[in-house]
Amino acid sequence: MIKFDFETHVDKNILEEYKELVSRKEEVLEQFNNSRMIGWSKHIGKNNIDKINNTANYIKNNFDCLVVVGVGGSYLGSYAFSQTFKKYFKPHPFEVIYVGTTLSSKFLNDLLVELKDKNYCINVISKTGKTMETKMIYNFLKDDLKKRYGEDKVKDHVVITTSDDGNELDNEPCIERFDIPQNIAGRYSFLTAAHLLPLATNFDIYEIVDGYYEGSNLIDEAFNYAGIRYLLFKHGKVVENYCIHEEHMLAFTEWLKQLFAETEGKEGKGILPMSTLYTRDLHSLGQFIQQGNKILFETFIRFKNSEIINYKSLDINSINNMVLDSVISAHYKGKTNILEITMDELSVRELSTLVYFFMLSASFTGYLFGVNPFNHPGVDVYKEEVKNILDEIITF
């Protein structure tokens, strides 16, 4: 169960304005339902899930590890999910290595050293088949495989996830191919093979799918979150700070940053997302939040139940929640508006539900801002600049 509290620590005048904003709910829902880009709200289908799961089992049975090559919406969701449930001092049972976010030569050199004695499979993910970083690193790894096994054997180490529009990547030989539907934008593609295939190597994706669709019951909560965020922006709160108290959720906040920044940040509008880990950042950014420029509001992501470890007759989770309650009280007294999202527990099922909730909220906020929630024209600007320089050099 996910609960959203926007009434306890939000200025009363904003809550009064929200009563009027609720009248726009039907308008926003109509825009959403009429969009051609909400394939992510439809059921993926059991046959697709089975195909993904069977391919993941093949990878686990035939390779030492999976190297996921992608960037942005192509992999942030699965990476964030995987990191959230990783043991602090122990890796997942099957190794999944995520690459594609940097073109650092040191990183790529270290990657080859890491893979030197491993029989690895590549899952290259790019909806357009044109993503520069993905093309470069995929070619880099293909060259390594060619040296090891010969050019004709590379295809036996590759799984491709792209759209079925005949792009360069769509024509690459491989073990298996998965399509990202045209009616799903990259950052909304959590319930496609782009994310489910890497996750299926270590998680029960049937449980992920079930939890995800439970988020469709949170339309009212999602609109409440979108509406309050929109009004806070109208009152000069142009930065949203996602506050977490579990370090493994830092990657999840990176996914949130991409989701909301790419959805809203257009036409001079949008809320800038940032994140803090408490209690760590109370000793740095906490000073700014308490007494600095009042340009931000906070969204706390909490969960009630956690592993119980006792300390002087109190369990650590209770102490942690007491600290968070104190932080919320202090920041609110310091004139920072605070929203709270609470899960019963940090579980695979509930986090999947939370993913749907956030995607629904992001799209609703986009409509409130009057922008298209599903495009990212600003990102395409840098891509065109790079294309002019490197397009002839980098091909699949």
Q: What function would you assign to each model-found segment?
A:
Residues 1-57, 326-327:
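Extended, charge-enriched "interface" segments that sit outside catalytic cores
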Residues 44-60, 221-233:
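A short, well-structured juxtamembrane/interface segment
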Residues 45, 98-101, 127, 131, ...:
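Hydrophobic alpha-helical scaffolding
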Residues 57-219, 384, 388:
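Glycine-rich phosphate-binding loops that contact phosphosugars or nucleotide phosphates
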Residues 84-94, 144-147, 259-270, 330-334:
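Short helix-loop-beta junction
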Residues 149-298, 378-396:
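Active-site phosphate/pyrophosphate-binding segments
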Residues 274-348:
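Helicase-primase coupling helices
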Residues 352-353, 360-396:
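Generic C-terminus detector
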